[in-house]
From Swiss-Prot:
Pfam families, sorted: ZipA_C
Species of origin: Pectobacterium carotovorum subsp. carotovorum (strain PC1)
Start and end residues of each stretch annotated as Disordered: 40-190
InterPro entries in the cross-refs: Cell_div_ZipA, ZipA_FtsZ-bd_C, ZipA_FtsZ-bd_C_sf
Organism lineage string: Bacteria, Pseudomonadati, Pseudomonadota, Gammaproteobacteria, Enterobacterales
PANTHER family cross-referenced by the UniProt entry: CELL DIVISION PROTEIN ZIPA
GO BP of this protein: division septum assembly; FtsZ-dependent cytokinesis
Descriptive protein name: Cell division protein ZipA
Protein's gene: zipA
Record HAMAP family: ZipA
Amino acid sequence: MMQDLRLILIVVGAIAIIALLLHGLWTSRKERSSLFRDRPVKRAKKARDETPLDELDEGVGEVRVKGARSQQNEPSFSSSSFDNASFDNHSAREELRSEATSPFEHLSPASSYDPLLDEATPVDSPRSQVRGDSNPQVVNPRETPIQPSIDTPRESFAYDAPPSAPQQPAAHSLHEKVQPAPAQPQQPAEPVEPVAAKEAVLVLHVVAHQGGVIGGELLLQSLLQAGFQFGEMNIFHRHVNPAGAGPVLFSLANMVKPGSFNVDAMSEFSTPGVSIFMMVPSYGDASQNFKLMLQSAQRIADDVGGVVQDDERRMMTPQKVESYKARIRDVLKANA
């Protein structure tokens, strides 16, 4: 007997627990459905409160709603009506879709309801001012086509500055002014012959063999035998008279700077070479004077064991001798 009573109590307790669980699930589902239904309604109400009706009318077109202020009674809902109705997710979606497609058809504000409370608390909506008849008719904005507005040109465009004249003629005239006159063909200039110098310096060098030097005593004896005399600027000169009288025909200097000699110390003197030079024109016949200078250079080179070189420090050749003679003739011709 006790076991049957215990079994009955266990079954009744299990049924009660299951009933409580089912009741809790049903209650939570109902609350969720109510929240989903009320949320879009509150959003639409808030948007209508923030946007004036005048602005909404302008978006429709030419239709204007005029009328006196009208107040509509807000619908009231009791808890019993919500208890008898069954809401599901499908019905909530259909309500959201219908309200989203026609937001202007619902002019009366919806009431807010909290399913957790026993009684519904109506929320007073702000009064909206409606112009027109007592029974306003609102046209669906999708049914009335919006007339495209064509902007007419304003008067300000009439006062625009006239288009500037094309600048091509001015550019053309400027081009005519800037265009230079055709240059006349220039006649080829006649070749100008080089002007011969009225004087020239002819130079010969007597140098020792490569790596050697010329001793002072040997050089002094050779110079005296060739008719040179020690004179001005501490160098040797060859006069018309070998004894040292008459004008100077050509002179001899040291190749090493300062180019002078010390006759008193010739025994201690040595040099790599000496230079013989003459001015053209000179006293007497310049060609004969050059011939004498060349003979003297060859004699000194033979005495000291050196060689004769031209003004470019090259070995003397017959072609170079003819070049010297041509220079003499050019200078004499320039002074004629």
